């Protein structure tokens, strides 16, 4: 786990020499354990954890003007210097325009600016401390710093309405630790703080400008290529090269590395058979430049990338994905590895993982991902986030109505009607989209607050039912039915408080708002996965969550997004533009069914351990859930009853 942590004091002068400005209430000097000081008094900044040398860059203009970039950033030192001068004048968006995934911190005199990303994969947290403000890219260290208690109101909101930003607001699981929203920056001036957005806000008074589909897809291609190239141009790393204990009889370097659980040197990628991971693997293998493989580590001639496919032996139904992955791996530039997993890699199989910064649904599948990533590379591409940035949230149908583009509803509604087999589907979907387009944001929150108070959680089933349920400003989460009345009442109060805050309303159309909320939740869950399934010396790369890729995807026309199969078609066009035209049959086929079957099977296999876990759950002791209700739902789900 890696993070940066800093501090902005209210003192006008520098603190005592050697304290780096961080002096506690009792006069003691506070230093993060295992930290690397990037700059000192009076507003110090540290990098904590196992950062690589090329992941921490500091560019200085003078003693009071400097920028630190932590993570993978494709900018040159000169570009960082230009961005520093732009940020000094207040143009924060320049700090987020470079390819890669990183956190930028700028110091200009006593003003410190910390930029979060657009997706939320690199969040920024802050808390008042010792008369100033402490900030970090992880919440748990700040909670430890101020000895914070758990925020049970946040946990209740996370269970009752996980997709509703108004319910969560800026809270975290730790009382007193706050989060800045995606697309914003934290600005500190001598301890005082301000949160400012750096993205332009579109007007809702007029229809959204019509974008050219071909140019928008070309922009997505360029952004993805630059994101992949930023990783390929970074130095190659040999994991654990300095901790090899030496020769072992009968074992070569590769065998010793495998025994220590080390990833393979170089760059690799997931190859699940889906379009997102396949696109990244083919781009990384085909771009000119240094290959991802490292000479002398067992790769054959011409192989430029390690591709890893997970084969679930405990659950069937993935034959089509495996066949597509095999066809893609026939590319001579790919070195293909298939990782087989049995019952020990099913969801819920191993919940005793590392302590993560926040709770998340990824904890359930951490062992499954860890088994796959253990055979991956030191730098490993994943397709996480592609669905969230490219697909159309059902609420985007309301956006089309607001822009008077009714004819573009025909194909998605026809696809839903075909899946449901009912002639009433078009009328129901159109009515729900029309109702949402005319419903104010405040009213949507009030409706959800009333639903929680009245415990109204029933929603229609099937694909059409899921789309109809999503055609709202806000909806309850599947775990809301297990919460106590007191917990639901507290979440309802939080929602009503959200409607009374100044400037209420997201300033976005409902579909765009729901899509951004879903992306933020997915990015936060990916963060949890990175920490729970972490392999030492390995870095996971999710280019679809890079700022420039997210921006390019947001510029795609709504009429293009809502078409059935749009994601696969866009990625096919991206590959064709990059020179890859030969794709296997079935490219872009959905794969939700196998994941659902695996989750159900894992739940059945781990039913006894889960029942023991919920024998005396901490959430029940805190008054958030009824343990009896949860155990009953677990037992029913293990026996095959439908899940909410």
Could you say what each language-model-derived stretch is?
Residues 128, 341, 384, 587-588:
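Proline- and acidic/polar-enriched loop/turn elements at helix boundaries
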Residues 87-91, 95, 162-165, 403-408, ...:
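Short loop/turn hinge sites at secondary-structure boundaries
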Residues 1-344, 358:
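Cysteine-centered catalytic environments shared across enzyme families
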Residues 1-34, 40, 240-261, 293, ...:
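Actinobacteria-biased recognition of intrinsically disordered, low-complexity terminal regions
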Residues 9, 35, 447-644:
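Adenosyl-5′-phosphate
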Residues 111-113, 121-123, 205-486, 532, ...:
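ATP-dependent adenylate-handling active sites, centered on carboxylate activation for C-N bond formation
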């Amino acid at each position: 786990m890696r993070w940066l942590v800093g501090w902005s004091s209210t003192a006008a002068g520098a603190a005592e020499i050697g304290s780096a400005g961080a002096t506690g209430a009792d006069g003691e000097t506070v230093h993060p354990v295992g930290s690397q000081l990037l700059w000192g008094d009076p507003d110090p900044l540290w990098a904590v954890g196992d950062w690589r040398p090329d992941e921490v860059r500091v560019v200085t203009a003078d003693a009071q003007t400097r920028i630190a970039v932590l993570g993978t950033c494709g900018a040159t030192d000169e570009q960082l210097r230009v961005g520093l001068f732009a940020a000094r004048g207040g143009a924060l968006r320049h700090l987020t325009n470079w390819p890669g995934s990183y956190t930028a911190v700028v110091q200009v005199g006593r003003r410190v600016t910390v930029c979060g990303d657009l997706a939320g994969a690199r969040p920024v947290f802050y808390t008042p401390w010792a008369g100033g403000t402490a900030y970090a890219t992880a919440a748990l260290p700040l909670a430890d710093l101020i000895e914070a208690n758990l925020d049970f109101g946040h946990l209740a909101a996370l269970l009752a309405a996980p997709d509703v930003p108004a319910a969560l607001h800026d809270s975290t699981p730790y009382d007193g630790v706050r989060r800045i929203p995606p697309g914003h920056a934290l600005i500190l001036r001598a301890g005082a703080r301000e949160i400012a957005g750096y993205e332009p806000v579109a007007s809702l008074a007029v229809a959204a400008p019509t974008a050219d589909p071909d140019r928008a897809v070309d922009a997505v291609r360029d952004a993805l290529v630059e994101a992949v190239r930023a990783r390929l141009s970074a130095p190659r790393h040999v994991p654990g090269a300095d901790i090899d204990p030496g020769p072992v009889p009968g074992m070569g370097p590769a065998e010793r590395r495998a025994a220590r659980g080390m990833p393979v040197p170089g760059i690799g990628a997931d190859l699940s058979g889906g379009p997102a991971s396949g696109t990244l693997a083919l781009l990384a293998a085909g771009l000119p430049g240094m290959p991802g493989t490292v000479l002398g580590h067992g790769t054959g001639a011409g192989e430029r990338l390690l591709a890893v496919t997970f084969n679930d032996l405990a659950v069937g139904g993935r034959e089509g994905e495996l066949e597509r992955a095999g066809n893609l791996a026939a590319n001579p530039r790919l070195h293909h590895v298939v990782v087989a997993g049995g019952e020990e890699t099913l969801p819920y199989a191993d919940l005793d993982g590392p302590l993560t910064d926040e709770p998340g649904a990824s904890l359930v599948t951490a062992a499954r991902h860890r088994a796959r990533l253990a055979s991956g590379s030191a730098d490993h591409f994943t397709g996480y986030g592609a669905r969230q940035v490219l697909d159309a949230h059902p609420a985007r149908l309301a956006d089309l109505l607001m822009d008077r583009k009714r004819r573009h509803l025909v194909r998605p509604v026809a696809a839903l009607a075909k899946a449901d087999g009912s002639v009433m589907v078009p009328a129901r979907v159109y009515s729900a989209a029309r109702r949402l387009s005319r419903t104010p944001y405040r009213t949507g929150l009030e409706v959800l607050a009333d639903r929680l108070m009245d415990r109204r959680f029933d929603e229609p089933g099937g694909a059409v039912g899921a789309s109809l349920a999503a055609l709202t400003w806000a909806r309850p989460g599947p775990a809301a039915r297990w919460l106590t009345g007191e917990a639901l009442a507290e979440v309802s109060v939080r929602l009503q408080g959200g409607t009374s805050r100044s400037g209420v309303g997201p300033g976005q159309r409902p579909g765009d708002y729901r899509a951004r909320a879903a992306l933020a939740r997915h990015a936060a869950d990916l963060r949890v996965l990175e920490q729970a399934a972490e392999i030492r010396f390995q870095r996971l790369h999710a280019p679809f969550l890079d700022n420039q890729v997210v921006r390019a995807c947001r510029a795609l026309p709504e009429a293009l997004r809502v078409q059935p199969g749009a994601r696969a078609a866009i990625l096919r066009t991206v590959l064709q533009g990059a020179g890859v035209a030969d794709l296997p049959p079935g490219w872009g086929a959905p794969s939700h069914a196998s994941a659902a079957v695996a989750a159900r099977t894992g739940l059945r296999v781990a039913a006894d351990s889960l029942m023991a876990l919920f024998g005396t759950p901490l959430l029940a002791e805190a008054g958030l859930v009824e343990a009896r209700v949860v155990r009953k739902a677990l037992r029913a789900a293990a026996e095959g009853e439908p899940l909410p």
